[in-house]
Amino acid sequence: RTLGEGMGFSSMGVGGVEAATRKVRVCTDTLTVAGYKLANVCCIATDNPTSRIGTGLLAYGDITIDYIHNTFAFSPHTDTTPNLYQPDWDVVLTVTPDGWLRAGIVWDKRLAIHSGDRIVEVNGHRFDNKLDMREATTKAFAPLSGNKAVIKFINKKGKEQKVVIKRR
């Protein structure tokens, strides 16, 4: 089932931050990986042509890829079926290589904020200066807790604008 659609960016790798593309957040009731069931698996799908395996799967078991014999194996850490559903925010906050906190993916199209907009405040915590990229990718940089947050961003007119986002 589709939980949301949006434009934006959220991935970063050796090639830098991905370009903004159409994203779809989808969830399936059950996903079976090498005979092991996972419940409520949600992921972000994109039309990017490169294959990706979420490293989050490693929290639930070990993966073996045998290229010589062309096989894939998954050895779960437990026999129970884990529920993997994790709510996501209406706006995914992202630090870009230029050092600014920005809206990565915007799932709720009704919000005034758009992908790429610079965020200057999260729950009263100001982000007037650039962030260190290493720190931003290894530590929690934004005070997000609970199921609701207030963020301020710079709108297209160059003015600060407030928006309330929710975790769903």
Please give the residue ranges for each predicted region:
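Pepsin/retropepsin-fold aspartyl endopeptidases
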Residues: R1-R168
